[in-house]
Each structure stands twice: as C-alpha cells, then as structure tokens.
Amino acid sequence: MMKLMLFSIIVILFSLIGSIHGADVPGNYPLDSSDDTYLCAPLGENPFCIKICRKHGVKYGYCYAFQCWCEYLEDKNVKI
C-alpha cells in the first residue's frame, strides 16, 4: 500500500512539473481560400490535419477543438 501511494505521488509530481515547464508551442489555425478553418475529427493526431499543415508549409498539425491546428504556423502563412 505504501509503495502504491509513493508511486502515485511521484506520478503526480512529474505531471505537475511537465505542465508547468511544458513547451507552449506556437501555431495557428490554417485558413482555406474562403477564410474558413479546416474542420476535422477525431481530435488529436489526425492525418488530414497533417496534410493541410504541410500544404501551409509546416511539418506537423493535429485536430484541436474540431479544427486543424498547425504548430509553428506563422500569421503570414495562415491563408493559402
């Protein structure tokens, strides 16, 4: 029981440290030619969003809030 409690405390501490010092990666929602965001599902890593982000000139993206989000997408590259 004591080992389980100690393990749980360690996991919680590492989770807190990761959320405090975690990298906040900049990015943007890419827009199509009609100034609309690209809708997506399922949430998380999504092949469609990765493809869209590559069209916008960045390497990685994912589905967040049912819209594609591209990491490191600058404001000037948002619209195709």
Swiss-Prot record:
List, for all copies, the residue spans of the domain called LCN-type CS-alpha/beta.
25-80
Under the heading PROSITE patterns, the entry gives: LCN_CSAB
MF (Gene Ontology) = ion channel inhibitor activity; potassium channel inhibitor activity; sodium channel inhibitor activity; toxin activity
Lineage of the native species?
Eukaryota, Metazoa, Ecdysozoa, Arthropoda, Chelicerata
Species of the source: Androctonus australis (Sahara scorpion)
Also noted in the record is:
Negative results: is a weak beta toxin because it has no effect on Nav1.2a/SCN2A voltage-dependent sodium channels when perfused at a concentration of 100 nM, but when added to the extracellular bath solution at a concentration of 1 uM it shifts the voltage of activation toward more negative potentials. Has no effect on the Nav1.5/SCN5A voltage-dependent sodium channel. Administration to mice produces no toxic effects.
In UniProt terms, what function does this protein have?
Answer: Inhibits the vertebrate potassium channels Kv1.1/KCNA1 and Kv1.3/KCNA3 in vitro with an IC(50) of 5.3 nM and 50.0 nM respectively.
**Domain remark text:** Has the structural arrangement of an alpha-helix connected to antiparallel beta-sheets by disulfide bonds (CS-alpha/beta).
The intrachain disulfides are: 40-63, 49-68, 53-70
Which InterPro entries did the record assign?
Answer: LCN-type_CS_alpha_beta_dom, Scorpion_toxin-like_sf, Scorpion_toxinL/defensin
**Position of the signal peptide:** 1-22
UniProt lists the family membership as follows: Belongs to the long (3 C-C) scorpion toxin superfamily. Sodium/Potassium channel inhibitor family.
- Expression sites (tissue/organ): Expressed by the venom gland.
User: Which stretches are annotated as coiled coil?
Assistant: none
Q: What is this protein called?
A: Beta-toxin KAaH1
One cellular component (GO) term of this entry? extracellular region
Q: Where in the cell is it found?
A: Secreted
Provide this UniProt record's keywords sorted from A to Z: Disulfide bond, Ion channel impairing toxin, Neurotoxin, Potassium channel impairing toxin, Secreted, Signal, Toxin, Voltage-gated potassium channel impairing toxin
